[in-house]
Amino acid sequence: MRKSFYSWLMTQRNPKSDEPVAILADLAFDDTTFPKHSDDFEVISRYLEDQAIFSFNLGHFDAIWEDYLNH
């Protein structure tokens, strides 16, 4: 079974990094409503577009998702 996107994302946290994946990880860490148990692209993508309490350049999300799928 695949690890949830959030669980994988937390392994990418690095407050000193300017990499988009590290930025998203730090933002998601502070967001108590982030869908922590999901591994579904549509659920995560829709959340980031419509419900996230933070602003993130979604142009980077597809590449981050590909990294998640390939881990």
UniProtKB/Swiss-Prot annotation:
Q: What is this protein called?
A: UPF0346 protein SUB0487
Q: Which Pfam families match?
A: YozE_SAM_like
Q: Which Gene3D superfamilies match?
A: YozE SAM-like
Annotated SUPFAM superfamilies: YozE-like (SSF140652)
In terms of InterPro entries, this protein maps to: UPF0346, YozE_SAM-like, YozE_SAM-like_sf
Task: Tell me where on the tree of life, at the top rank, the source sits.
Answer: Bacteria
Organism annotation: Streptococcus uberis (strain ATCC BAA-854 / 0140J)
Q: Which family does it belong to?
A: Belongs to the UPF0346 family.
